[in-house]
Amino acid sequence: MNFRPRLIHLRPKHSSRTRLIISFFLGAFLAVACQSTKTADTDLTTQTLAKINFADWIIVSELESQALLYLEQEPLKLGSIGSAILEKDPLNLIGRLALSKFYSSLGTIETGTDFKESYEESIRIISESGNGSPEKPWVVSSNQVAELFLKDRGISRVGGVYQSNLQQKLGLMILGLEGVNTRPQEYYFDLSHLLNSANAYLSTDKTQDSDNPWPLLRLLSESRDSAAQAAIGAYLVKQKNYKSAINWLTASAQQDNLFAHTLLARIFWSQFSGIEQMLRSDRDESTLTAENRESLRSQLNDLKTKSQSHHRQAISLGSVESMYTLGRLLFEGKFGPGKVIEGQELLEQSGKLGNAESFLFLAHHYRFGSIVRKDISRSTTFFSQAAKLRNPEAIVAFARFLISPAGEGFREEEQFGIVKLLEELVAEKEPEAMVVLGNLSAAGVQTDQSFRRAISWYKKAVKAVSNNIDEASDEIINEVAWILATTSKRSLKRARYALRIIDKRMQDSTLAREKPEFLDTWAAALAANGQFEKAIEIQKQAISK
């Protein structure tokens, strides 16, 4: 008789229809923020993983979970567990460490050392199977082994999700923290080698693809595997089946999965915003009944509270994204008045952990003073902090700020190093950085004034985008043409060049021809070249837009 071990079924409630839908779609494609990855080297897979049948793998997986619970506090319980694991899977990482700790706790140092050495050999083999990137994931035999492997490197797991794509049929992305005051990083693993044996054992449909991840993911989710629950939840979000998605993600979040918490926070806030917009659009009370409006209003506070709660739980797990998002919402008064200070604290915390957007957000608000009192000095500090994180948007924004009248009092500050930061972007072929370097050279800000150097930077920027027809490239050409056509500095003016580049762009780009600011530039370039009648005609088109 073929004995089939069963896992404990703990899953969120969902209808049989929903389950059928999930089974059908997920078998074809599991759309959960996947990234392109390469299949692990088969030789390394053979070295890393013992050839065990899937029924034994299920038992080993359960034992691995038990062993992880006892590793630190109750090593005497590890003897029977470790032995049972290695009996079925002799190369198992967790089994080897379990027996190492068990024998060491008994004072049997030599035996404990032998198992410790075999454990370290397993660690080495996994390390050599990849580098933890999406392109070269580490090959492991289970979610639990991946967690222990990271723990051996001083990385604490705070979340994760299974992923699937054409190159890697079953991957695992784990979010981990390395030390205190750090932001979670992504670590990638490959478990695709499990699928053939898993599907042969689990699937009743023998015509089903042998590398379909769904049967195994369903089994894992029913065994309270948080990453599997998160994967199903994320897939259902993609399908806009939010009710079922929330059930699965909630089950995952209950096990402190940062990925699930952040996704739930976004879902609840999206639902809140949708209802708020619906009520705002129905101010004349022509569509919704009074009863419907009251029902919708009653949901608003609940959705806001849930979103905030999940953001805070994600923050407790180290989420920099939730620090930024919740900080911004509090700062903007979305959760009521008097939350600006708390919001700014979260934003600054997020910025110090590497989120340049947080510093940039504060820089803009202190520059214009819409929510807080205008403070150019603080704005400059936040711009500088954002730029030093080497965020391209922040570097460009800070440079433009220094050139603007608002930044005039801080232009001579040498510690900013903005030119060096822009040159780093230029090395990465960033055309907007070239334009801004031209602006700095033309104005003599943070560098010596040189019109020749400015023109050189402008032409390099135009050359970099001349073959691209897109909005960003349009903007580069429009800015350069405007500067060189309208400048009052004779040594900088290049009217014919400005007309040539804007003429060509207006011929090539349909989008540019529809924008009044581009028509303004075209008219200015025509006027600078003495073509006044055509300039007036184009200017009229701009006004009519």
Language model region names:
Residues 50-128:
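Alpha-helical protein-protein interaction scaffolds
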Residues 104-125, 455-462, 532-544:
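TPR/TPR-like (Sel1-like) alpha-helical repeat modules
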